[in-house]
């Protein structure tokens, strides 16, 4: 029983010489894994019993480099990222390739520009915790009895905090003999955990966070930011496209149509622990302001989680 599990059909690793095809394969593998877990979860909630574990896994990207030096004539040689420092095998797991599409595409492109060769994309051995497969507005566990919820751990992988430390980002991670070097500061599971915590702490979806983030513990700064945000939405010539408040309450700039998920926004009965407000501009170039309240623990918590967005 423990050695067997119900998984998506095996997909062999593929090699890519351009960023777009690598990203498309990552997206396809990730979606296959999500579909597998979501379908099994629907069956589990409706009463189906499984005699094996149900598992699906994060996609990975891997690169083998023969030298650490950048390719001669690379347009990206002046950047401080997008390359590896020494020869070897580098690998990382990936998640939410929809949310991170532009980021992943740029990183893939730079790796190929800087080192040549191919990117290898495949299915990793890192299981996706079933909670991280739910769509944002799914509230599946609420439909189950306590006994059924307890049984979940026998069937599905649950979040494992031991697999989510910050050893890579802190520079303390040492790969074992035969293991690849890390290709990213954060593993997919660590990123998924932070994306979930961002929703909880800020009251807004991770997709709304902008690349310029301000932190404050003074409410009057937030009040002024909210005033400026609504003011910008009344200006048809503003470069800002939307203003997002806790509960994913979206105000679009005058003249712009509402989008599908806008209707799901709802003012929460009470503000979350660290409310987030987002003045949205094209390509995430707007401003996010977070009220971190009091205490250094809040500041460390929220920055640890926003870090996975690579603002």
Question: How would you label these PLM feature ranges?
Answer:
Residues 1-311:
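Accessory terminal and edge-of-domain segments that mediate assembly/interaction
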